Amino acid sequence: MVPKHTIYCLGEVLLALDADAPLAHAESFRPRLGGDAAVLAQACAAQGGRASLLAQLGEDPFGHRAASTLAAAGVDTAHMRFSRTLPTALLFEAGGEALSYRVRTAGLQFAPEQLEPGLFQPGDALLFASSGLCDSPLRYTHLAALTAARDAGALTCFAPCLEPALWPQPEGESTPREVTRQLLPRADIVLLTTEELEFLFGTAEMRVALFPLLRGHTQLVLLARAEGIHAFTRTNHAFWPGLSLPAPRLAAKALCCLLQKNSTPEKLPRLTTRQLQTIL
C-alpha cells in the first residue's frame, strides 16, 4: 500500500563522476547521481513512498540530467529550484580519493526564502542528512524546514549519512560533529550507524549514547549495528538480529511504514515494543 502522505527529502543533489585511475591521471569518468537528498529520495521512491525533493540545481545540462534521472526513478521534482547564476555541484571520485566542487554552487545556496509556504501537511515527513549542514544558506533552509514541518504536524527524520570529507573547513567554522549534534535533538526520528555513534559521541556503546540521543524532540532512535538493527523509544526497544540495510534504505523503509500507519510526532512516544517491531 502506497502511503498517501509525502516524504520531503531536503538537501544537496550533485553529479558524481567516477574514474578507475587516480584523479590526476584519469582520462574518462562515469557519471552517476549523487548527494544525500537524491539518494534518500530515490530510496523512498523505491520503497513505494511518495518522495518529493527539496533542492536547488544549476540551470545547466548537469542539473537537468540529475532532475531527469530523479523523475525517472519516481521522485517528484516539482518543488526543485534551478539557478541561472550558480552551477550544479560536481564530485570527482577515484579509489577513495574525492574532489568536490560545491562551495559556490546552486545546491548549497538554496535559501530559506525559496521554501514554499504551506508546503508541509499533517502526516507528511521531512527527511534530511548532514552534508548540506556545512556553513551555507542550505543549513538555514534546514532549520526553516524543520520549524515549518513541526508547525504542520509532520514527522522529521535525521539520517546524517556522515561524510566529513565533504565538509569545507574554513577557519572558525563549526565542525561536522558539532553541527550534527546540534541538529539531532530537533528531529523526531534519528538514524545512526555504529561508526557515526562513535564519531559523534566518542563511544560505540549504544546504552551510553542513548542518553544524549533521546532528548529534545527525538522520540525514536534507529541504530544500525553489526549484530542487527535496534529501535529505541524512551520506554521501549525492538531488535532485528542479523538485519543489515544501508542507511538511506533503512530510513526510507521505516518512514514509509510509519506513514502507512498514520504516525505523527505525538504518537511516537506511545509505540509499544510490538508496534516498533513492525516498522521494518
Description of each model-found segment:
Residues S130-F211, G228-I229:
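Conserved beta-alpha-beta core of the PfkB/ribokinase-like small-molecule kinase fold
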Residues L119-Q121, L183-L184, R215:
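A short, aliphatic-rich alpha-helical micro-motif
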Residues C9-L10, H79, C157-F158, L191-L192, ...:
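General beta-strand structural signal in soluble alpha/beta enzymes
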Residues V2-Y8, T147-D151, A204-L280:
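Conserved phosphate-binding/catalytic region of the ribokinase-like
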Residues R50-S130:
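Conserved N-terminal subdomain of the carbohydrate kinase-like
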